[in-house]
């Protein structure tokens, strides 16, 4: 049964924190299905927070949205070198595998998705020229403010942190979409995009924003969070249970509660995808026995009323997370080279430091051997200068005068 434009809009926007351009999105839906992109910069190892945007991708696909997943490798490098160039390509591959495996585990047909690697178009002439045009029409203050909640903040920021937001705006044009989807932490970049694209002669896009799900320790969940504040996609049940049991979970308090937030934005939507209708907490009989909830609202009310304790909430969450991860890890068995990809993408810090040190030494050795200039000349198509040519050039300068 096909959905009406209003039904599609409701499905597209449910569980979102904010929508920019709602009127425009509705107008497009009255004529055709919308196109949208979600971008992810391959920096730290993917964690359970990635289930949150995946649930929305499921909603988008169900609503007939044409979805593009951008693996933003150039952005990963620009973000204060979170992903060195030596590692970024390996991380792109690892992220792609993880995203596809999460979606498959949720029975979301990935055939309807388009995967694009940022460097496949961001290094081309037309994109580069537009990037210069954007830079010439955007103030440093605007770019810095736009990336404040997304780009890593350091005492002495690199110039790359100012390039990052503008490229994210340009991606909307070069991916040919109507809408960009991301976390509410991206809001300032989205607003910048709405301002700068029309200046370049391109149309303004709509923007959909997910709430930021708190980590297990409270605060924003991210790949750079402390290891015990996030659950890795590859964590085993014992590790998952240990992390959840140590989570910050104040009795009766809903705000900044990472356990409740995960249930709301991941567990219950996942149950819907699997056709399940009950969230079950299997307490031992001596502690009250089994608890059954039909909706997230029932769970939240019980927690507020203190009829559901933090310990029992965590017990139910452990089961939910382990079920989700078991499905993903089963899909990952299709990739026999996963271990080697993971090691290449996230090598031991000691090994990485050793490799970088060796690379630096190799450059020094090459310079001493006089090969550096020859390599540069060869790459540019010019022949290396001979000693006699160099002497002749100095003569022409008339240095004695």
From Swiss-Prot:
Pfam families found in the cross-reference section: tRNA-synt_1b
EC number: 6.1.1.1
Region (Disordered) location: 352-401
Reactions it catalyzes: tRNA(Tyr) + L-tyrosine + ATP = L-tyrosyl-tRNA(Tyr) + AMP + diphosphate + H(+)
Motif ('KMSKS' region): 220-224
Family annotation (InterPro entries): aa-tRNA-synth_Ic, Rossmann-like_a/b/a_fold, Tyr-tRNA-ligase, Tyr-tRNA-ligase_arc/euk-type, Tyr-tRNA_synthase
GO biological process: cytoplasmic translation; tyrosyl-tRNA aminoacylation
'HIGH' region (motif): residue ranges: 42-50
Alphabetic keyword roster: Aminoacyl-tRNA synthetase, ATP-binding, Cytoplasm, Ligase, Nucleotide-binding, Protein biosynthesis
Segments of skewed composition (Basic residues): 355-367
Top enzyme category: ligase
Segments of skewed composition (Low complexity): 368-388
CDD domains, alphabetized: TyrRS_core
Residues engaged in binding L-tyrosine: 37, 164, 168, 171, 186
Family named by the database record: Belongs to the class-I aminoacyl-tRNA synthetase family.
Described purpose of this protein according to its UniProt entry: Catalyzes the attachment of tyrosine to tRNA(Tyr) in a two-step reaction: tyrosine is first activated by ATP to form Tyr-AMP and then transferred to the acceptor end of tRNA(Tyr).
Protein name stated in the entry: Tyrosine--tRNA ligase, cytoplasmic
Taxonomic source organism: Schizosaccharomyces pombe (strain 972 / ATCC 24843) (Fission yeast)
């Amino acid at each position: 049964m096909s959905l009406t434009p209003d039904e599609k809009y409701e499905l597209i926007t449910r569980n979102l924190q904010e929508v920019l351009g709602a009127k425009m999105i509705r107008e497009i839906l009255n004529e055709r299905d919308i196109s949208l992109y979600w971008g992810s910069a391959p920096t730290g190892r993917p964690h359970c927070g990635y289930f949150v945007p995946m649930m929305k991708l499921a909603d988008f696909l169900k609503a007939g949205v044409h979805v593009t997943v951008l693996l933003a490798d150039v952005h990963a490098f620009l973000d204060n070198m979170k992903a060195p160039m030596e590692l970024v390509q390996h991380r792109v591959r690892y992220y792609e595998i993880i995203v596809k495996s999460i979606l498959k585990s949720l029975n979301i047909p990935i055939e309807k998705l388009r995967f694009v690697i940022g460097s496949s178009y961001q290094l081309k002439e037309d994109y580069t020229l537009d990037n210069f045009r954007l830079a010439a029409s955007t103030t440093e203050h605007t770019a810095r403010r736009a990336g404040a909640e997304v780009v890593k903040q350091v005492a002495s920021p690199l110039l790359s942190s100012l390039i990052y937001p503008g490229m994210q705006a340009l991606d909307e044009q070069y991916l040919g979409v109507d809408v960009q989807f991301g976390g509410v932490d991206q809001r300032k970049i989205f607003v910048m995009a709405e301002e700068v694209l029309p200046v370049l002669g391109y149309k303004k896009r709509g923007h959909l924003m997910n709430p930021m799900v708190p980590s297990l320790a409270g605060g924003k969940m991210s790949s750079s969070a402390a290891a015990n504040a996030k659950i890795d996609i590859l964590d085993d049940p014992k590790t998952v249970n240990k992390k959840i049991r140590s989570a910050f979970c104040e009795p009766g308090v809903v705000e900044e509660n990472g356990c409740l937030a995960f249930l709301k934005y991941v567990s219950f939507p996942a149950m819907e995808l699997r056709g399940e209708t009950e969230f079950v907490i299997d307490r031992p009989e001596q502690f009250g026995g089994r608890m059954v909830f039909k909706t997230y609202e029932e769970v939240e009310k019980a927690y507020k009323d203190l009829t559901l304790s933090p310990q029992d909430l965590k017990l139910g969450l452990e089961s939910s997370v382990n079920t989700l991860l078991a499905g993903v890890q089963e899909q990952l068995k299709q990739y026999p080279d996963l271990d080697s990809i993971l090691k290449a993408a996230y090598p031991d810090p000691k090994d990485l430091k050793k490799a970088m040190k060796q690379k630096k030494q190799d450059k020094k050795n090459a310079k001493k051997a006089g090969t550096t200039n020859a390599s540069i000349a060869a790459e540019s198509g010019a022949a290396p200068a001979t000693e006699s040519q160099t002497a002749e050039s100095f003569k022409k300068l008339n240095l004695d005068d």
